[in-house]
Swiss-Prot record:
Family listed: Belongs to the eIF-3 subunit H family.
Biological function: Component of the eukaryotic translation initiation factor 3 (eIF-3) complex, which is involved in protein synthesis of a specialized repertoire of mRNAs and, together with other initiation factors, stimulates binding of mRNA and methionyl-tRNAi to the 40S ribosome. The eIF-3 complex specifically targets and initiates translation of a subset of mRNAs involved in cell proliferation.
Primary location group: cytoplasm
Location within or outside the cell: Cytoplasm
Gene Ontology biological process terms in this record: formation of cytoplasmic translation initiation complex; positive regulation of Notch signaling pathway
InterPro entries assigned: eIF3h, eIF3h_C, JAMM/MPN+_dom, JAMM_MPN+_peptidase_M67A, MPN
GO cellular component: eukaryotic 43S preinitiation complex; eukaryotic 48S preinitiation complex; eukaryotic translation initiation factor 3 complex
Subunit structure: Component of the eukaryotic translation initiation factor 3 (eIF-3) complex. The eIF-3 complex interacts with pix. Interacts with mxt.
Protein name, entry field: Eukaryotic translation initiation factor 3 subunit H
One function term, GO molecular function aspect: metallopeptidase activity
Length: 337
């Protein structure tokens, strides 16, 4: 996981609050290249972010990928230390400031992401996780987002209490597990000049495909993932309902046993015999362990994300459908005349 090597990182003596993330173009290109290469193999791309903190800005100046977990001969910790040591020799920022990973069908929220960012953020206070959406970026929309765990989520994870009472006490929901940090991309003046020159050499877009709906794969993937997440949430709800039924049955039996004991103690008191303490009955009914609700909370967040993506995609497709219908009607009217 991405928390491998977090304990070897160093922290900066600066404010823990990060207002925004500034990422160099070189680091962005390396992340994009790595994520797209791994997406072809259906693997999750992960890597380390290097940089420094200036005031309340986290500057990401470089990055490198983590070795694949399937390579048993690779010492992952030694690999990361060697890379950072060599970067230091060539005067490149080598301080560990977080990690990055690719996202699956536009949805990055997961238990593994939460655990990894918790280990990072407790070891490197200013660390962030940068998530790159390969599918959305492949359609021409660069999707690069930075996240940090909220203080409530960190406190909940430290306590290790994921019961419904803990969620209510800390006021934690799927929408308050992570806080999105604004991210900006910065290039050097020479790079900006080169990009301007390249832009002039590119052919003009004639706009032939602006009405392309492209609903086949995108909507299908989101719907499939949404159905899977809904099934998982249903199973979590079934397990929690069974727990509540068992607790209700146990409480009913305990109250019945206590009432019976109270009647027996009243008879013993009338006869002058010693009464039996209620603790003897209570010991027979051990409290049931409360099932953790963290998985259900994360699944709810994934469902919400998929629903938002589907709603956004459908609204854009409906607009294109209305435009296409108008063009088709205009064409038919022209042919009739």
């Amino acid at each position: 996981m991405a928390n491998r090597g977090a304990r070897h990182a160093r922290t900066e003596d600066s404010d823990n609050t990060i207002n925004y993330v500034q990422c160099d173009g070189l680091a962005v290109m390396k992340m994009v290249k790595h994520c797209h290469e791994e997406s072809s193999n259906m693997d999750l791309a992960q890597g380390a972010l290097l940089g420094l903190v200036v005031d309340k800005c986290l500057e990401i100046t470089n990055c490198f990928p983590f070795p694949k977990s399937g390579d048993e001969t690779m010492d992952e910790e030694m690999y990361q230390l060697t890379v950072m040591r060599r970067l230091r020799r060539v005067n490149v920022d080598h301080l560990h400031v977080g990690w990055y990973q690719s996202s699956d069908v536009g949805n990055s929220l997961s238990l593994a992401l939460l655990e990894s960012q918790y280990h990072y953020q407790t070891s490197i206070e200013e660390s962030v996780v940068v998530v790159y959406d390969t599918q959305k970026s492949s359609r021409g929309f660069l999707c690069l987002k930075a996240y940090r765990l909220t203080p409530q989520a960190i406190q909940m994870y430290k306590d290790g209490d994921f019961t419904p009472e803990a969620f209510r006490t800390l006021k934690v929901g799927y929408e308050s597990l992570f806080a999105e940090i604004p991210i900006v991309i910065k290039n050097s003046p020479l790079t900006n000049i080169m990009m301007s020159e390249l832009n002039e050499l590119l052919p003009e877009d004639k706009g032939h495909n602006f009405l392309d709906l492209g609903t086949a794969s995108v909507l299908e993937n989101h719907m499939r993932s949404l159905i899977e997440r809904v099934d998982e949430l249903y199973q979590e709800a079934v397990r929690y309902n069974k727990y509540q039924q068992v607790v209700f049955k146990q409480d009913t039996e305990k109250h019945r046993a206590l009432a019976k004991l109270a009647a027996e103690n009243a008879v013993r008191t009338s006869k002058g015999e010693p009464t039996v303490p209620e603790e003897e009955v209570i010991k027979q009914f051990r409290p049931m362990p409360v099932p953790a609700r963290l998985t259900a909370t994360i699944t709810s967040g994934q469902i919400n994300t998929h629903a938002q993506h589907i709603a956004q995609f459908c609204s854009q497709s409906l607009a294109k459908l209305f435009i296409t219908e108008s063009l088709q009607n205009a064409k038919e009217t022209k042919e009739i005349k």
